[in-house]
Amino acid sequence: MHENENMDLRTQIGQHFVCGFDGPTLEPSFIEAVKRYKIGNIILFARNIKSKTQLYALCQEIQDLVRSECGHDALITIDQEGGMVTRLSPDCTNVPSAMALSATGDEQLARQAGVITATELRALGVNVDFAPSLDVNSNPDNPVIGVRSFSDDPKQVTRFGLAMIEGLQEGGVMAVGKHFPGHGDTHLDSHVALPVVEGGEEQLAIHLEPFRKAISAGVQGIMSSHILFPALEPDPVPATLSRTIMTDLLRSEYGFKGLVFTDCMEMQAIADHFGTVEASLQALQAGVDVVCISHHVELACKAVELVEAALADGRLDADSLKQSTKRILQAKTMLSEQEIL
């Protein structure tokens, strides 16, 4: 299943996108996008989920559609962190936030929260959780992370973050540590602005520690941040679009071999400054595996066309993309073969 030699180009490109849709049922426009543009992965929000029964049926419908059109399982993704960041319906289990778990001082509770979350998600048909936040919340004015972080202490974030990752992956769901290389020292929210982290190497090392340790411990996914890090990337591009950060640091220096996802490319940090469609190509050029376009699937369709053109004229290296596709398909195989608790 993980060989991509016989996959046509559009189907291959579609593997590199995760997209969302409105409502609790598949929209005709979304179905058409999967059929024409071979979108291979889905993100779910609260807008898609009314009950456990409905979510299970929806996930089965998504898998049937994607398998028939793309020939492979879909990554069905969700932001189910616990606490304030929950997408599931009230008849599902919502574990406490990262900071609440950390306040107990017992990281085994974080592991158990991960197992509970993953077991339920997997039973409902979801196989990727964009959690936990590995951000070190060192800025008290941070408007977006706050209690989503385990702590302002990198060792505490590492201890609890690794425990939750272990629990999620033990439960058969891919854990995705976010927001690399750290969203904890910002006073702006990348949903609505383009933050800059001005710290030098010593300061950045604090924020990188949980990610470095999570990679060593076997986290299967990492999500990028739409933040400028001048100490890491001298050009005025956020981490998501930086080959220096996404490939040289994350892949080469830290040795990460799992899947790299972008944060949503419709966030204003990207959309207002770089353009969602154009930045999707830049993210793939930087070494990201899966581009997330959460709300407007027509933007993903345009991005697929742009990637096709970039492969044709050499702006995007075909061999590098093939290696990335192989990682995605291997991850899908791994998830499909895992036993569910």
Q: What is each stretch, according to the model?
A:
Residues 309-340:
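Mid-to-C-terminal alpha-helical segments outside catalytic/metal-binding sites
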Residues 134-144:
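Short, conserved phosphate-binding/catalytic loop or strand-edge motifs used
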Residues 2-25, 81, 164, 263:
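Boundary/entry segment of secreted carbohydrate-active catalytic domains
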Residues 32-45, 116-118, 123-128:
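Catalytic domains of carbohydrate-active enzymes, especially glycoside hydrolases
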Residues 51-58, 103-119, 153-159, 202-205:
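Glycine-rich anion/phosphate-binding loops
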Residues 92-105, 149-151:
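A charged helix-plus-loop insertion that forms the helical arch/lid used to bind
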Residues 20, 26, 48-70, 74, ...:
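Second-shell residues forming the walls of enzyme active-site clefts
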